[in-house]
Amino acid sequence: MLIVVSPAKTLDYESELPALKTTQPRLLDDSEALIARARQLSPADISSLMGVSDKIAHLNAERFSLWERPFNKKNARPAAFAFKGDVYTGLDIESFNDHQLSEAQQRFRMLSGLYGVLRPLDLMQAYRLEMGTKLDNERGKDLYAFWGNTITELLNKDMKDAKTDVLVNLASNEYFKAVKKKAVAGTIIEPVFQDEKNGNYKIISFYAKKARGLMAAWIIKKGLKDPAKLTQFDVAGYCYCEAQSTALRPVFRRPEQG
């Protein structure tokens, strides 16, 4: 199985890192083209385009300005250790041993508006450029047009290298829209996480994001290869709900937390 998740807005470039053998993102020429376009934006443009505060807009204008190749351990950080949102709280990459990190490097991918596809140990310079951003560019009106088939083709290559024909989508709709579903060389499984609230089960964003990270870590640490065994996921109080599930859309539910 190859797992895909969304990136996070919150970044950590401060905390101590273990000794890691890092890799380079594989689509940096594309990233460089996007950076050149983003550098044409004023902080006011960024604020309007991304719907962010002036402070965040200025920070990201500075990030675009400072972005430079080559990436090294002084100016960049391994992607899975840099992202710090809810998905990554669930993932808890710091708890992975060397074998598990190696497994993640082969089977875990982060989609990115700037970098396209990232492996856990790919070095990444700080940025904010969400996939849904309507940034017109040399290839079209937005980032979906910019990335075209590139992301899908790289995921297909990664699936082939990992000897799997199953893609587990743990990303948001905004990000997975960058994947051409009909061109994926295999089966797409899209787990759903629902929490009980006032007697009803529904997707609660904060919990669902964390659950996606929990499932990704669970798959990697167990070395799971058979997608049929995804139904055994039972972390943090979630359990498989057969009545609500289909083979390609397994549903996991958790009773209301006391």
From Swiss-Prot:
Q: InterPro entries, per this entry?
A: YaaA
A Gene Ontology biological process in which this protein takes part is: response to hydroperoxide
Question: GO terms for CC?
Answer: cytosol
Domain of life the protein comes from: Bacteria
* Disulfide-bonded cysteines: none
Please give the family membership noted in the entry: Belongs to the UPF0246 family.
Name assigned to this protein:
UPF0246 protein ABO_1338
* Species per Swiss-Prot/TrEMBL record: Alcanivorax borkumensis (strain ATCC 700651 / DSM 11573 / NCIMB 13689 / SK2)
